[in-house]
Amino acid sequence: VLIIAVLFLTACQLTTAETSSRGKQKHRALRSTDKNSRMTKRCTPAGDACDATTECCILFCNLATKKCQVPTFP
């Protein structure tokens, strides 16, 4: 009896999830792009002000000058 109850509850959850996701496909796609835009960080170009929390574009933040700059290799 317990196995039958578990199978019944599992089937109910699957059909409920399938039914509710059909009408919300458009909204799910919108949420996905919103999430991606929040996850995308903007970077600071060379010469702009920066600090320890700033993400410089393919550069590094020179904390002495507080500006993003290209690394120089000896």
From Swiss-Prot:
**Keywords annotated in UniProt:** Cleavage on pair of basic residues, Disulfide bond, Knottin, Secreted, Signal, Toxin
Does the record carry Secreted as a key word?
yes
Localization in the cell: Secreted
- Please give the chief subcellular localization of this protein: secreted
Q: Where is this region: Disordered?
A: 19-41
Disulphides: 43-57, 50-61, 56-68
Found, by tissue, as follows: Expressed by the venom duct.
- Per the UniProt entry, the propeptide covers 18-40
Q: Does the keyword Cytoplasm apply?
A: no
Q: Which N-terminal stretch is annotated as signal sequence?
A: 1-17
**What are the recorded GO MF terms, alphabetically?**
ion channel inhibitor activity; toxin activity
Record's Gene Ontology CC terms? extracellular region
Family affiliation: Belongs to the conotoxin O1 superfamily.
Present the record's domain note.
The presence of a 'disulfide through disulfide knot' structurally defines this protein as a knottin.
Record protein name field: Conotoxin AbVII
Organism encoding this protein: Conus abbreviatus (Abbreviated cone)
